[in-house]
């Protein structure tokens, strides 16, 4: 990876105060390298500039670290190339992550890179439709999706995969009306416990993370 990648990664980690040590940074770099290598043959990401990838894929995934601090298991729904699950597993080596996606070639990458990096990540080629046992998916302490940003769609689906006491997370490209988030959670017996708004430090793109827990 080039100097721009390292600068963007370091700047994002430092600006957001993320607990990422040197060993984790090395794993993140190897993941990014394999992602771009596979992407030449398999369409995994539209972002191919290393610095942009560092910020918009890696740093943006790692923003979840404080919100999953107490989790032992995490389910990443619609994971694509393993985002945010694999970056989180690079930092939280104790975290058991399941990445699921309906596109088999993307899960083939998830499996290959996780084995190469010796991460506690399992890839499952299935479209999550709310039937964890039938789909071979776990009920997890933390359930997240970057792919399904619409809370009206995501909350009813994600709630079905929550373990007792678990946290449902939505990564949003913008701040959403809090009342709408409250209502989406209440319909599933969940309470909105946080709506954190932040800005990516290089691109200044606005982001938000919403969190729900069962009442």
Swiss-Prot record:
It comes from the Bacteria. Transmembrane segments: none annotated. GO terms for molecular function: rRNA (guanine-N7-)-methyltransferase activity. InterPro entries: rRNA_ssu_MeTfrase_G, SAM-dependent_MTases_sf. S-adenosyl-L-methionine binds at residues 78, 83, 128-129, 146. It is an enzyme of class 2 (transferase). It is found in: Cytoplasm. One of its GO terms (cellular component) is cytosol. It catalyses: guanosine(527) in 16S rRNA + S-adenosyl-L-methionine = N(7)-methylguanosine(527) in 16S rRNA + S-adenosyl-L-homocysteine. Its main location: cytoplasm. It holds the Pfam family GidB. Keywords: Cytoplasm, Methyltransferase, rRNA processing, S-adenosyl-L-methionine, Transferase. Coiled coil: none annotated. Its EC number is 2.1.1.170. Belongs to the methyltransferase superfamily. RNA methyltransferase RsmG family. Specifically methylates the N7 position of guanine in position 527 of 16S rRNA. This is Ribosomal RNA small subunit methyltransferase G. It comes from Anaeromyxobacter dehalogenans (strain 2CP-C).
């Amino acid at each position: 990876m080039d100097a721009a990648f390292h600068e963007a990664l370091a700047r994002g980690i430092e600006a957001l105060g993320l607990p990422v040590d040197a060993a984790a940074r090395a794993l993140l770099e190897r993941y990014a390298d394999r992602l771009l290598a596979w992407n030449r043959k398999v369409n995994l990401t539209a972002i191919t500039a290393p610095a942009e990838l560092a910020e918009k894929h890696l740093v943006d995934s790692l923003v979840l670290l404080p919100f999953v601090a107490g989790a032992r298991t995490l389910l990443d729904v619609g994971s694509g190339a393993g985002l945010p699950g694999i970056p989180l597993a690079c930092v939280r080596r104790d975290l058991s992550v399941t990445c699921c996606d309906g596109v088999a070639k993307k899960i083939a990458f998830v499996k290959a890179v996780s084995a190469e990096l010796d991460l506690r990540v399992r890839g499952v080629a299935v479209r999550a439709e709310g039937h964890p046992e039938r789909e071979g998916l776990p009920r997890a302490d933390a359930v997240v999706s970057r792919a399904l940003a619409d809370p009206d769609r995501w909350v009813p689906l994600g709630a079905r995969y929550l373990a007792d006491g678990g946290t449902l997370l939505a990564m949003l490209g913008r701040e959403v009306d809090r009342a709408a988030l409250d209502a989406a959670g209440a319909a599933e017996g969940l309470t909105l416990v946080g709506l954190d708004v932040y800005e990516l430090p290089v691109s200044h793109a606005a982001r938000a993370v919403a969190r729900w827990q069962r009442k």
